[in-house]
Amino acid sequence: MYDSEFEDITAEELKQFIKSHNEKEYLVVDVRQPDEYTKGHIPGAKFIPLNELLSDFSGLPANRDVIFYCHSGGRSLAAASMFSEEGITEKTIYNLKGGILSWEGRTLKGFPKIQVFDKTKMPVELLLTAMDLEKGAWRFYTYIMDNFEVDPILPTLEQLSKAEITHAKTIYRFWEKASSTPMTFDQLYESLKGEILEGGESLATALAYLENIEKNPCLRILELAIHMEYTAFDLYKTMAEQEKDRTIQNSFLTIAQAEKSHMRMLVRSLDQCV
C-alpha cells in the first residue's frame, strides 16, 4: 500500500503534460455520466462513471499517473481524493481544475466557489469554521429543497440536511470546552452566517443561476454538493491531525468518515439525474 495524495492540474498544464509524456505513462479518466461523455470528451480518456468507479478501483493502473476530470471539477475532486486513499498507486494522482469546461476554454459563469479554510488557524477557530461549514451545508440543502424540483434526489437531500445539524452539535461540544466565552448551541448556531462560498456571496443568490444554466440542473447541484462535502471531509481530517487529545481526534475522524459517506450518497444519486 502506498501513502498517496493528489494534486490539482490546470487545463494548460494538462495539455503540456500530454505533449511531454508517453501514453504509457498516464491515464486520463472521465468520471461524468454517459450522456455527458458522448457529447464530448478529452481524446483518449477512459470513461468510468463516478458511481461505478467508487465501487471498484481495480480498473485503474498502479504504475501510471492518473488524471481525473468531470464537468467543472467537483466530481473529479471526490474521485481523486478517494482513489488516493486506496493507496493503490505510487504515481501521481491529478484532479483537473475546472473540468472539461476549462479544457475547452470555457468557464461556468457564476458557479459557486466553495470557501477554502485556513489550515493554520487555532483549533478553537477551526471548530467555528467547521460549525459554519455545517450550517452552510444545511442552508444549501434546505435552499435546494425549497426552490428546485428535485424529487428524484429529495430523500438524499433531506437525510443530509438533518445530518449537518447533528454534526454541528457534535462539534459544538468540543468548541464549548475550548472557548473562553461559550454560549448555548442555539445562540451560536443562530449567529453563524453559514457562508460556505468565497467572498461571502449570498448562498441563495449564488445558487439561483442553476435553475436556467442547463436542461439538467440536478447534476450541477450534486456536483457542488460533492465538492462541499469534500471540503468538510478535508477540514475534519486537518483538525484531527492537529488535535492531541485522542478522544477528540477520534471524534473528528468519525465525522470525516461520515462526510465521506455523504459524498458516496451523493455519487449514488447521480444516476437519478435524468
Describe each region flagged by the PLM.
Residues 1-27, 31-39, 108:
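Flexible, polar/low-complexity N-terminal or interdomain linker segments that lie immediately upstream
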Residues 94-100, 104-121:
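Active-site-adjacent scaffolding segments
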Residues 16-20, 55-62:
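Short amphipathic alpha-helix with an adjacent loop that forms part of the alpha/beta core around
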Residues 150-151, 245-246:
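Short loop-to-helix capping motifs
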Residues 146, 152, 162-163, 168-177, ...:
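Long, non-catalytic architectural segments outside compact domain cores
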Residues 109-112, 179-216:
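Carboxylate-rich helix-loop segments that flank metal/cofactor sites and access channels
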Residues 57-102:
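Catalytic cysteine-centered active loop of the rhodanese-like fold, especially the PTP/DSP P-loop
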Residues 126-146, 156-161, 170-172, 221-241, ...:
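A structural feature that tracks compact, well-ordered secondary-structure segments
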